């Protein structure tokens, strides 16, 4: 069984036992998180939401809180010898999907 979950402005296809890297979620390591915005549930019978599937949810456990790899942002203006280099590390949460309720 699988589901399509919407979180952090993005959509993820998940199954039970999957590890999922998403935008930062509040909570400590070991806490459970429940997603109620389920767009689709699949398995023997596929249910597509309009826009959400009613009474469906996905439960996951927070495995790790941390930062992603560094992204370098380089800006320059031509012929002016003006350069700017910035680095950015996005906060992220790693989840383990425990249960899909459909």
Curated annotation (Swiss-Prot):
GO biological process, any: translation
Function: This protein binds to 23S rRNA in the presence of protein L20.
Coiled coil spans: none
Subunit (UniProt): Part of the 50S ribosomal subunit. Contacts protein L20.
Organism field: Geobacter sp. (strain M21)
InterPro entries in the cross-refs: bL21-like, bL21-like_sf, Ribosomal_bL21, Ribosomal_bL21_CS
PANTHER family per UniProt: 50S RIBOSOMAL PROTEIN L21, LARGE RIBOSOMAL SUBUNIT PROTEIN BL21M
SUPFAM superfamilies: L21p-like
Protein name, as recorded: Large ribosomal subunit protein bL21
């Amino acid at each position: 069984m699988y589901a399509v979950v919407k979180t952090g402005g993005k959509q993820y296809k998940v199954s039970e036992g999957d590890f999922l890297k998403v935008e930062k979620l509040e909570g400590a390591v070991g806490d459970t998180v429940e997603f109620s915005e389920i767009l689709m549930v699949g398995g023997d019978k596929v249910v597509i939401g309009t826009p959400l599937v009613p009474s469906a949810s996905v439960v996951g456990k927070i495995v790790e809180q941390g930062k992603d790899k560094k992204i370098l942002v380089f800006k320059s203006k031509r012929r002016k010898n003006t350069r700017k280099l910035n680095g950015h590390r996005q906060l992220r949460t790693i989840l383990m999907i425990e249960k899909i309720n459909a």
